[in-house]
Structure formats: C-alpha cells, structure tokens
Amino acid sequence: MPKYKTSEQVLSLMKDRTRVRNIGIIAHVDHGKTTTSDQLLAASGIISPKVAGEALALDYLSVEQQRGITVKAANVSLYHEVEGKGYVINLIDTPGHVDFSGRVTRSLRVLDGSIVVVDSVEGVMTQTETVLRQSLEERVRPILFVNKVDRLVKELKLGPQEMMQKLMDIIKEVNNLINIYAEPELKEKWAINPTLGNVVFGSAKDRWGFSIPMAQKKGINMKHVIDAYSTTDKTKINELASQVPINEALLDAVIKFVPNPVDAQKYRIPKIWKGDLDNELAKSMLNADPNGPVVMMITDMKVDPHAGLVATGRVFSGTIRPGSEVWLVNAKAPQKVLQVSIYMGQFRELADEIPAGNIAAVLGLERARSGETLIDIRYKDLQGSFEKLHYVSEPVVTIAVEPKNPKDLTKMIDALRKLSIEDPNLVVKINEETGEYLLSGMGFLHVEVSLQLLKDNYGVDVVTTPPIVVYRESVRNKSQVFEGKSPNKHNKFYISVEPLNDKTIELISNGTIKEDMDSKEMAKILRDQADWDYDEAKKIIAIDENVNVLIDATSGVQHLREIMDTMLQGYRLAMREGPLAHEPIRGVKVILHDATIHEDPAHRGPAQIYPAVRNAIFAAMLMSKPTLLEPLQKLDIRVPMEFVGNVTAVLSRKRGKVLNMTQSGSVARILAEIPVSESYELASDLRGSTGGRAFWGTEFSKWAPVPDSILTDVILKIRERKGLPKELPKVEDFLS
C-alpha cells in the first residue's frame, strides 16, 4: 500500500471517531515490544516488510539502536482494514526499561487500550506488573500478546500439551494482576480469555501470530508451530507468517476489544480529569465532541532542530487547527498553534485540522512541557486539568558534567536545557558554590543514556564525575521546641519537628494529598487514612516536593500574616538542604508553635527571616535522632536453581536482602531489595556469578534509613565531597 495514499486515508478517517483506536504497547524490557511495533508498521506500508524487525523504525535515536532498548515513546498512526472497513490506529511505543518509566506513565494517559507483550519463557516480570498496574489505574484496557513462542520449542523443547499449559499459566498470571489492580466493575469485563480472542500467541520476529478464533478459522494449531521450528528449513516458518500474519492477529484484536475514543472517554475522563465534571469542557470531553472547546493533554516535548519545540498529545475535545489560540493551564500562559500534523513513523505529515479522539503533533507551544493541559483560550477561567501525573520513581543518581572543551560551555548548557524539556525525569541543577552542572536521573542507565544523547544529538562531549547516589535527610524521634533567632535578634520562631508516618508519606507521594487542595478535605483524608488529629491536619500550610509538611499551630501572632510568604520560602529553602550533609529533607513534620515578629518591615526581610526559620528547624532535627535515607531498588531475578546460592552471595555482599523466593520448574524467582549505592556493578556481578543465566528487572522501591554502622561514614564522605567542614554539625551551631 503506497504511503501517500495512507496518510490521506488516515486523515479522512480521523474525522469518524468510531473508526479510531489509541493504543500503546507495554512490556518488560526485552520482551519484544519494539519488534512487535515494527511488524505493525510494516503491514501499514510505512516500512518495507523485508526490513521490519531489523529496522526498529520506532527506535529512531541511535542510542536506542546501539543498546537495543527503547528510550523515547514514539508515535505513529496506522491504517488497518477489518471486513472491508478502514480504521486508524494511533500507536504509541513506550519504553520497558525501568529507568524510563516516567515516559511510560505519560504515554498511558492518552491511550484507551494497551497490548501487553510477555515473553513466553520469562513470563510476567516486575516491569510487566508495574506497567500493567499503571495502565489499569488509568483505565486503559489490556490485550495480551504472548511473544517468542518459538523459544518454547527451540529452547525448552516442549510438546503441544506442555506448551498450552505454559501459555495458560501466563494468562492466569495476567488475569491475577487484572483482578488485583482493575476496578471492581471492570475486573470481569477486562479479563483475558483465549476463546474470545483477546490474547494472541506468536513470534514478532518471525512475523506470525494468532488468536484462538483466528487459528480455528484458518485451521492452524500448536502442532503446526512445533513442526515449523523442528526443521532447519525456514519455509514452514514463512508459511506460518503468510497464513497467520502477526499484524492481522493483533490489529483485529485491537479493533474488536479496544474501545473507540467516544466510548472510552465516557469512563476515562472522570478518572483522569481533575476539575468540575459539569462544566462545558468536561461535558465536551465526555462525548469526545469535535465541535466543543479544544482540550488537549501534552505527553511529550521534542526539540526538532528545524522546527523548534514539537508538542505531542491527545486531543480530548474540540478540533485543533493552525491559528487556534490556546491557554496552558500549568504554565498559565496563552499560546498560538502554528502548525498541526500526525505522525507516520518518525515523520510528521501536515494536517489542516485534527479532531477529538486523535493524537496530534503541534508546533508553536514554546512554553508547554510534558503533562501540560491545553484548553481553548475562551474557556481559560474554567478551572481543571489532567491531574499532575505521578511518576513511579524519582531521580536517585547524580553526576557532575563539564564540557571537554571549555568553549562548548554555552552549547552544553543549552543542550542540557533541551534534554530536561524532553525528559521531565531528568533534573538539571547548578551547584551554586562549585559552579558544577549536576544531572540527576532514575538510575545509572538513565544518566548514561542522557550523556550519550548529549553527544549524539547536540555534539557536546562532556567529562563526568563518577555517579553519586542521592540521599535524603530525616528524623526518627519527636524533638522539643527550639527557638530560632534572626541575625538582628528581633524575630524569633519556636519550632519542633517529628517524623511523618508511612501512610502520610504514601498519600503525599501518590498525589492523594496536595498542597493546593481544600484544607477540610485534606484533613478528612489524613484523619481517616493516616491517623492524624483533624484539627492539626487543618493547620497544614505547606507540603513541599520532598514530602515534608509545615503546620502553623500559632494563635494570634502579630505580623505573622505579613511575613508568611517569606517564612514559607525560608522553610522550603531549609528543606532543600538539611543540616547533616546538605541533602534534601524528606518525611518530616515541622510545627511552628509560636513566633515574635518585629513590627517594622525593614527589620523582618528575607535576610532576617530565612536564617531564623532554618536554624530552629535544624536544631530541632539534630535533637530528634537524625539519619540519612538511601534509595533502595527492588530486584526481580529469575535464575536456574543451581545458581541461587551464587545470587544470594552477590546480594549479601551488596547489603541486599532477599524478600521472597519461589520456584517454578527448575527456575527460581528471587525478589530482593538492594541499596542503589551498591548497584553500580550489579549487572556484571550477576552475569559473572551465574554464567550469564540470570534475568532480572529493577525498579525504585523506597527510601530507607542508612544502617547506623555506616551512617557517620556516609555523612562524612558526602560532606567531604561537597567541601563542607569535616566534623558533624552540633545543635549549638544553630542556636545563637
């Protein structure tokens, strides 16, 4: 099918919303997600069928092709016919490697269905579970694709009965997860059932795949598969590919089981739209109305060397056209759309307009960032947005970068800025004291890939320090009240600190509790779910990004209102760099009990208020068993039984602990936790000790206290690295 015809067909079909499907492919790393995407593209005539699987059309960054993993979520619109009717399928490829899960979470918001790819031999892995859980939370309907079925014949040498058993086990495991994570009314409706056809078995690499209904129709069964792989001759495999082509099996299932945008938005908008569901914007979105006001959610920002910033996202309501005036809800800024287009592989094809229910690429939104909500400017006073996406992990590894050639400094700064626009999980900071540029990511791989992108895309060669793990400071006990005085002694703050309980930390981290919510609603949630006193919870005046809260327990303090903003800023600055090692503070409740404030504004500026607030908080922290928290990673390791001892030895050398171990057949599955600081050489150690026979996945687990036996050591090392005095701070240092 010639491509020019396709892009015209795609554009005309987009107007009929019942013929549109928005899907993504999600999976654990290396289970064959991008190869699956390629087969779907090849069938649409976007890549030639001969090179699909080699081409990795969606892996268009050279980093991805070298490493063979997908880093960016790429978009493409496909054309597919079922029973003579044409459909548009917007396909979004998402990364399966844990270091990039921020991108997965973002892509899910704009999908209505997902193809979950699982390797037939490895089965359901941690990352499969994480992405499936996230997609069910976003009300995205799953279809299952069990890939690499050829491995059951070639490597495990199973017969037809055993093969079916192995495949049924995977289906059972996926249904188990749907049962745990899907909402009650969707559990049964969305369960995977082979006889209905919402599961496809096949091999993406060899281009064949079938659902049970399709196999019955075409007279194919598992015996044919075993025969095809039992000879060295490829002809039988090619016959399979022409009898049951993978793209037909998957896309037929997508069209049958994934809802169109009109049906999907009815039940997805109430879940993902944070705002009044009765106003005009929400009503128009619930119906995916192309004639309503424009509402679009931006999921991805890319820097195109020729076109500038390209924003990609889904139009939930209205029709977006060049010249549309829109309002960015998060940036609080008006913008004008210059150009709209659809994706075909990595290329953008211009369009005159893109109606609700479709994925669009938009030029002209210089101020937009991933996660932005964009609405018709005439409706900017109607409040509401797609909730702040909560990503699954937070940046835990930092490196300092400087250009190899000092002349490249401005080029590097510009490149870092662009990278952080494209990837919100990458944090770029400047260390004011040393002038270093710090880059923080989700794990060693994330940071490594970002450096490679600097070199490939922006031509900047950088010198880096070894990766540094990020810590947090916290407390373990309740402190007494401390007085913090301003340098001029005219302002005093009386403050105590105590640790937040785990439930509160969880509610803030997952976005249930937010600083800007109604205080009564917040207090009710904290009382019912986290054992707070209702009256105390109502007095929360700040929650910062590192999960600390500030409570104003004062009554009738004169002039406090007037300096409130300055005091809050002082609190936030203190929370960014704690007393032990200048690392961010996490999980602390700060209570302001009383204050004395000078009546003359000249004597109560930031230079007086900041140190007073900070000193009281730091003194209180040092008296309440302060500690460092380190990031832990969850490991999910599959390894033959005979290597279990070697794996546990590697883990215990790295301060890891085994949480659970199960066995199926001759393979053990070990769930463990290990500090990120110890995981640097983990890959080579695990491979070395198991002769390369261990598969594993990692994922951010939680922050946990550094063991007391090494605490002082760790603190002193960080202080030395930051050029701070070698001795630990004392309470007296902060009391004047």
UniProtKB/Swiss-Prot annotation:
Keywords per UniProt: Cytoplasm, Elongation factor, GTP-binding, Nucleotide-binding, Protein biosynthesis
Highest taxon, organism lineage: Archaea
Localisation per UniProt entry: Cytoplasm
Gene3D superfamilies (UniProt xref): 3.30.230.10, 3.30.70.240, Elongation Factor G (Translational Gtpase), domain 3, P-loop containing nucleotide triphosphate hydrolases, Translation factors
Residue numbers bearing the Diphthamide modification: 603
UniProt function note: Catalyzes the GTP-dependent ribosomal translocation step during translation elongation. During this step, the ribosome changes from the pre-translocational (PRE) to the post-translocational (POST) state as the newly formed A-site-bound peptidyl-tRNA and P-site-bound deacylated tRNA move to the P and E sites, respectively. Catalyzes the coordinated movement of the two tRNA molecules, the mRNA and conformational changes in the ribosome.
Family from the record: Belongs to the TRAFAC class translation factor GTPase superfamily. Classic translation factor GTPase family. EF-G/EF-2 subfamily.
Name of this chain's protein: Elongation factor 2
The gene coding this protein: fusA
